[in-house]
């Protein structure tokens, strides 16, 4: 990586913009395949008949064959003679695209490292902690309770492959690399094989996921550059002058710079964007733009976003993909939680001289609840219970050993408790635990051809211990006779920084 960093160091000739020569470096494909820098294990050298000195020729030959369509038709006899020539067309594309994805990520990684290093001495989160899904919720807790309206935005998906190429045009100025990228994309018959939108989020084909995720994230970055567009005062958006986008760190700085620029040149439109309470969050294929402003202000933002995306990406964007909702009157599905802003009334008794009276203090509070009905639906779909929530046995697992069955059920229960540890009300989670525990008991009883009651008498409390969550285990070991106040700590919200994906059962959409 140090060698790559030295190669991409900026100089007077701006040679760091030319990434195409790196495609012919063999260690790039070792990095792409997570094989480290061991040349002997690279995917390009796992074929017999090739040595370490021919990496340049191998990659060049691969690219040549990708362009020569007639060379992809290889007879069985030829493939037996030379296993490397027996690779099919998709393998050629996959090998090169994986290396290409690794290469184009390098400038972004270096830019990200330099951006984070500029914050030395300041209190910021580590970058790997920012990847956690739960790192978003404390931000919402602190800020959303004071806001009024929110724009629920379904990020538009690119309807044409050329949009993805144009998105990278401002980051990668190497024409050869862009031509190769365009060829990769046109290897696919249509966009449906690359990105599908059956769910609110986006799903990618299993092949070359790293490559497609990079393209999609670059495209989303361009969509989010709407705010930067105002600062540039131009219809031609160039994102190269800004660091890597980590919306939880840099968004407020961008808003401050926007206000500073518009205070000089655009006094008339300044009131539209000068909102210190504007907050932005992106998750899955959606984003949220919340503000303390009024409904007309949010409506202006809505039509501005629609017009900008239509003009910049040359595509039709339906206004129905953006909804304006009032936080106090609307509950939204947010990454497996039901989130809302509720008014909690706090009664305070005040006494003045001989007179006493009650004061009602309404306090807004951001709540996160467990969506019990959809979650039970997910359990029913996985055959743990009926649609009404009645536990049933899992016949598919009855051939496993008792320890494996208990471990699987216990792991699912602990994962759900781990993910929903930030819920405001955790009583519904105990219903989920009851369903999984009884389903486990019925599965074991079915295996041993006995009744549930007989099996529970024989197993004792061992089955219960497998379903204890990590928080309950700590409390039970540290405080064997924990008081109600200690269990109140467990009932409070707990956010973890090690959750990088939504549990399959929690992702019920």
Curated annotation (Swiss-Prot):
GO terms, biological process: mRNA processing; RNA splicing; tRNA processing
Domain of life: Eukaryota
Signal peptide coordinates: none
Subcellular location: Plastid, Chloroplast
Entry keywords, A to Z: Chloroplast, mRNA processing, Plastid, RNA-binding, tRNA processing
UniProt-listed HAMAP family: MatK
InterPro entries the UniProt entry points to: Domain_X, Maturase_MatK, Maturase_MatK_N
Family that this chain belongs to: Belongs to the intron maturase 2 family. MatK subfamily.
UniProt KW DNA damage keyword: no
Keyword hit for RNA-binding: yes
Main location: plastid
Organism: Solanum tuberosum (Potato)
A GO term for molecular function: RNA binding
Cellular component annotations (GO), alphabetically ordered: chloroplast
Pfam families linked: Intron_maturas2, MatK_N
Gene that encodes the chain: matK
Role according to the record: Usually encoded in the trnK tRNA gene intron. Probably assists in splicing its own and other chloroplast group II introns.
Name under which the protein is recorded: Maturase K
